[in-house]
């Protein structure tokens, strides 16, 4: 299996989070994008501020590697209008894919109409501009029943408003990789959670983010029906190695 075409190679830490300078962060992003281009990874996933730079790098290399960014990251509690403004700026900067953090807290509080409205508006903006859209549901905060319910909500909003013909361009994604769990519990994709997402979001696509640390696990995810894998160790996984990175 050519696992490279399933990999979204990812660097999302801010300079403060990584304990490095802004220029060092920019260099890390450049390294990630170059690595994605050289290894023909499906996509490089980066913060919005780096989209323009990354786009220029991909153009210069005449590469098919896509550029993706995160919206409403990482808490997901931004007002919908703020998420849409951030997404529109990324579109203006020539991003290929938009990974929104859904307002999972609102979902847990029973504010279903708010979540439906957000999913509709965010998806419409992306699809109207020929961008793939992913909805991060942050599985570490959800029960299995909530994973099922939120996956079904996103699926139903997309199918009811945009039709099955757009299902291949919308994903339910597991995790941000930034949620802090207690007692060493995983904050990224698990096989159990991804099985629930795949079964309850199809015909939409599914992205497993975080927690995949080796080639065999990546292949197992794909065979389960996962169509993208977000990881900060794409090269290690592609080369058949194992990583201790949490995302």
What are these regions (language model features)?
Residues 78-93, 142-153, 194-204, 212-227:
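Catalytic cores of alpha/beta
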Residues 75-89, 109-120:
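Glycine-rich anion/phosphate-binding loops
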Residues 48, 52-73, 112-134, 141, ...:
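Alpha-helix-loop-beta-strand connector modules within alpha/beta enzyme cores
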Residues 33-53, 98-116, 138, 172-186:
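Glycine-rich, proline-tolerant flexible connector loops at the mouths of alpha/beta enzymes
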Residues 11, 69-71, 80, 92-107, ...:
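Glycine-rich phosphate-binding active-site loops on the catalytic face of alpha/beta enzymes
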């Amino acid at each position: 299996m050519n696992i490279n075409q399933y990999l979204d190679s990812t660097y999302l830490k801010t300079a403060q989070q990584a304990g490095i300078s802004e220029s060092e962060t920019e260099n890390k992003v450049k390294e990630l994008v170059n690595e994605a281009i050289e290894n023909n990874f499906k996509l490089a996933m980066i913060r919005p501020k780096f989209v323009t730079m990354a786009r220029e790098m991909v153009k210069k290399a005449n590469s098919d590697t896509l550029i993706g960014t995160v919206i409403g990251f990482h808490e997901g509690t931004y007002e919908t209008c703020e998420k849409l403004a951030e997404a529109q700026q990324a579109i203006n900067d020539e991003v290929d894919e938009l990974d929104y953090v859904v307002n999972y807290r609102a979902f847990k509080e029973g504010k279903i109409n708010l979540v439906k409205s957000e999913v509709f508006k965010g998806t419409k903006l992306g699809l109207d501009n020929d961008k793939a859209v992913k909805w991060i549901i942050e599985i570490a905060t959800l029960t299995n029943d909530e994973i099922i319910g939120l996956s079904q909500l996103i699926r139903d909003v997309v199918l009811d408003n945009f039709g099955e013909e757009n299902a291949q361009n919308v994903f339910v994604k597991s995790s941000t990789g930034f949620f802090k769990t207690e007692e060493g519990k995983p904050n990224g994709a698990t096989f159990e959670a991804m099985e629930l997402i795949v079964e309850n979001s199809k015909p939409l696509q599914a992205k497993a983010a975080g927690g995949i640390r080796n080639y065999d696990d990546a292949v197992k995810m794909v065979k389960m029906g996962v169509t993208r894998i977000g990881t900060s160790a794409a090269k290690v996984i592609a080369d058949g190695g194992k990583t201790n990175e949490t995302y």
